[in-house]
Amino acid sequence: MNTTPDTPTPRALRELTPLEARILGVLVEKQHTVPDTYPLSLNALTAGCNQKTARAPVMNVTDDEVTTALDALKHLSLVFEGSSSRVPRFEHNLNRVLGIPSQAIALLTVLMLRGPQTAAELRLNSARLHGFADISSVEAFLDELATREPPLVVRLPRAPGARENRWMHLLCGDVNVGEFAGADGGGAEAVAPSEFEALKAEQKRLADEVARLNALVRRMASELGIDADAPGDAN
């Protein structure tokens, strides 16, 4: 599908960090879903990044981390800071930097916020950003994004048992699509590299917490003269 004649010329763009991509996704989303509060304040933007629903992975970032990422995005001209309010407010410039139409921006936004999606899922989840007539129109824009140089999305191999291929954005860099080839097709989503690192960190945190609690239980049992390893009363 061809872009509109007045689509801006795309600019070269470095790989984004997961937080930078999340910020852009939140700005586009809130521009359409809560236009009365757009451009967004720092507090609203951080809350949108940490939102528990419609996000994969769920993040827990601070205002300072968001501010640092915003500074980097402003340097790339991807975000502008407004000066008409006492409270700094931020808006995206994604369509001009990438040189793509609003339909493609809607699809990229959902991919940045929710992770890999099928074309059908993208049509459903982007409804508040752009109303696609059918799945074919979604696929047409995805194909165009995938054939750009450099490509902005990639079609992932179909997982065993899955009926449709999923798509993933490439704003955070290339992915090894082979990692997704053997993914379980039973409804679980394949994990992106950034998500995998977050999961490993969370696993380590939980393991450390379990070890700390075990040590606490043993110390309390020792103070009470109880054998912490003894089996409990069966009655």
Swiss-Prot record:
Lineage: superkingdom: Bacteria
Pfam families xref list: DUF480
Spans traversing the lipid bilayer: none
Disulphide bridges: none
Family classification: Belongs to the UPF0502 family.
Name of this chain's protein: UPF0502 protein Bmul_3231/BMULJ_05293
Source organism: Burkholderia multivorans (strain ATCC 17616 / 249)
